[in-house]
Regions:
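A short, charged helix-loop
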Residues: 1-9
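Short, surface-exposed, polar/charged, turn-prone segments marking secondary-structure boundaries
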Residues: 8, 31-33, 124
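Glycine-rich "substrate-gating" loop/helix at the edge of Rossmann-like oxidoreductase active sites
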Residues: 9-10, 21
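Short, basic/aromatic-enriched C-terminal tail that caps enzymatic domains
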Residues: 114-127
């Protein structure tokens, strides 16, 4: 559904960048958190902590991490665009630069027929 959000050029692009900054940016953050927890072997403890606050959070995080793998190669460029959008607004842009790197590391899953195992995704991030 097309919506008009104003007469000014660039408003729709800015909205798209802000929306993806959250939706795809938080998925990259969750993926990085899971990989970081995997490295010292505290992922199960993290799950217990998350699930004590929100009983389905760890399952949602796992699902979000694995379901983006086939499209992650596209998200790298989008995160770089978002980073530029933040910079143009006078805001720090490092988070989305890091998100671009997370998606870059997942690019090997492009066109994979089946959703990969979480452990395989985390291994690709930790390389």
């Amino acid at each position: 559904e097309t919506k008009i959000i104003g007469d000014e050029i660039g408003k729709a692009s800015a909205l798209k960048m802000c929306y993806a900054a959250y939706s795809k940016g938080t998925t990259a953050l969750l993926t990085a958190i899971l990989a970081t927890a995997e490295s010292p072997g505290v992922r199960d403890e993290l799950y217990r902590q998350w699930d004590s606050d929100d009983p389905n959070f760890s399952a949602q995080a796992n699902r979000r991490t694995t379901r983006v793998t086939a499209k992650a190669w596209r998200f790298e460029g989008e995160m770089r665009e978002i980073s530029s959008t933040f910079e143009e607004a006078g805001l720090p842009n490092g988070f989305h630069q890091a998100a671009a790197e997370i998606y870059h590391r997942m690019a090997g899953f492009k066109d994979v027929a089946e959703t990969p195992r979480l452990e395989d995704v985390l291994e690709s991030i930790l390389k």
